[in-house]
């Protein structure tokens, strides 16, 4: 080698934490975790479930679920957006596309009655992901449910039923809804 050091400067052991299965939505890469406890505080204060906590002290501290429990909440996908270092990522769609490849579109959430603003990210006119939007008047980010975050997968599925059928005396016919 012509440039740089030929031997390591870091001789201590590196901290290795095994990844945990905390549910079907959130994937963990716990070696990235910096113990900011944003996910713990979000689960307790906003989602209302105390499924995630910090265990141990000092160098041996870890964030995980109690007794290998699953983090189940309607708002559990929001910890993906809260994590500053990417220790908590989306399990159904991890690193599918780069953000600069996607077209951003502001929209209103159709799955709840609150009119929550969401951001749709499109590629080739197909929805790739849905993230919470913010209100322009207050610049406040909203929380979205897991149903909102992942509902586009079923909406644009080729197996989705598009037409209604009416079954009269063993004879099926199209039902006009207009």
Protein language model annotation of sequence segments:
Residues 1-178:
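N-terminal export/assembly segments and adjacent metallocofactor-ligating motifs
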């Amino acid at each position: 080698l012509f440039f740089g050091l030929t031997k390591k400067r870091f001789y201590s052991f590196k901290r290795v934490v095994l990844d945990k299965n905390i549910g079907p939505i959130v994937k963990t890469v716990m070696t990235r975790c910096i113990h900011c406890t944003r996910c713990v505080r979000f689960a307790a204060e906003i989602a209302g479930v105390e499924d995630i906590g910090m265990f141990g002290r000092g160098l041996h501290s870890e964030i995980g679920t109690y007794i290998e429990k699953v983090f189940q909440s309607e708002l559990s996908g929001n910890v993906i957006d809260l994590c500053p270092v990417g220790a908590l990522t989306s399990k159904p769609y991890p690193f599918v596309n780069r953000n600069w490849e996607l077209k951003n579109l502001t929209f209103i959430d159709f799955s709840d009655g609150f009119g929550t603003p969401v951001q749709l990210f499109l590629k080739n006119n197909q929805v790739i992901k849905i993230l919470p939007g913010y209100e322009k008047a207050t610049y406040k980010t909203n929380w979205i449910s897991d149903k909102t975050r992942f509902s586009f997968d079923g909406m644009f599925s080729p197996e989705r039923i598009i037409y209604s059928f009416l079954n009269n005396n063993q004879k099926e016919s199209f039902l006009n809804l207009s």
